[in-house]
């Protein structure tokens, strides 16, 4: 049961990390992060923080936001790749790797939140200079949802970090590993609990193997020879 619970946490972590990458990719493709209204009789144009330093809005702060978003995309890809390697056991799932994934998730979420807040500040700052008003679109809300997903992923990694480890440093429970090995070898152990005050029997363990079955005719022949000699 513990092993199943750990695998569910890992799958949930992978789910949030994968959707973060999907929403970041959608944010790159869709350029309608904000609608900028140039004037009463002028058309409305769209703007995205991935496109900076346009003739309409020549600001160095937008280039900083773009660079932060590139770092966020790179860290999110590394985080998802590391979680995938852990989920498929391509790398050992130790406490060090879980700390690394948790730190990557929190760092990526903080950087993305800082980039979004800075973008809002730049929009308010350029409202009276380059355009008359602005309106944010739904893609910014998905970006804030990415921040929530990254923080949830970090907390899930910390939750896995609190799981006990065995001697090899892996977070797979020892009991689950033993049961898997026993199932592979076809060995089953049944534990029978005796009531209190019952005396322990001498020996109730009987071994039945293929070797004993093969040796049983030879033993019968030896016993027959002994009986014949006695007669």
Swiss-Prot record:
Subcellular localization(s) per the UniProt record: Cytoplasmic vesicle, Secretory vesicle, Acrosome membrane
Residues in the Extracellular compartment per record: 35-67, 119-135
Cytoplasmic side: 1-13, 89-97, 157-231
Cellular component terms (Gene Ontology): acrosomal membrane
Subunit description: Interacts (via RVxF motif) with PPP1CC.
Protein name, UniProt field: Transmembrane protein 225
Signal peptide: none
Main function: Probably inhibits protein phosphatase 1 (PP1) in sperm via binding to catalytic subunit PPP1CC.
Membrane-topology descriptor: Multi-pass membrane protein
Record motif RVxF, residues: 225-229
UniProt KW keywords: Cytoplasmic vesicle, Membrane, Transmembrane, Transmembrane helix
Main location per the UniProt record: membrane
TM region(s), chain numbering: 14-34, 68-88, 98-118, 136-156
Pfam families on file: TM225
């Amino acid at each position: 049961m513990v092993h199943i619970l750990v695998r569910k946490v890992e799958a949930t972590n992978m789910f949030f990390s994968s959707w973060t990458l999907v929403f970041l990719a959608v944010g790159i493709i869709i350029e309608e992060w904000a609608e900028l209204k140039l004037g009463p009789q002028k058309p409305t144009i769209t703007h995205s923080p991935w496109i900076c330093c346009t003739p309409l809005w020549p600001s160095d702060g937008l280039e900083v936001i773009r660079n932060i978003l590139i770092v966020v995309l790179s860290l999110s890809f590394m985080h998802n790749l590391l979680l995938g390697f852990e989920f498929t056991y391509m790398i050992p799932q130790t406490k060090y790797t879980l700390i690394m994934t948790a730190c990557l998730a929190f760092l990526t979420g903080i950087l993305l939140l800082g980039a979004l807040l800075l973008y809002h500040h730049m929009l308010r700052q350029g409202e009276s200079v380059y355009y008359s008003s602005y309106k944010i679109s739904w893609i910014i809300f998905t970006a804030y949802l990415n921040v929530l997903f990254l923080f949830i992923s970090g907390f899930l990694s910390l939750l896995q970090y609190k799981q006990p480890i065995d001697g090899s440093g892996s977070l797979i429970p020892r009991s689950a590993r033993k049961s898997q090995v026993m199932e592979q070898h076809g060995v089953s152990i049944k534990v029978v609990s005796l009531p209190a005050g019952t005396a322990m029997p001498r020996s109730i363990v009987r071994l039945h193997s293929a070797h004993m079955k093969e040796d049983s005719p030879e033993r019968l022949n030896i016993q027959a020879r002994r009986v014949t000699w006695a007669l």
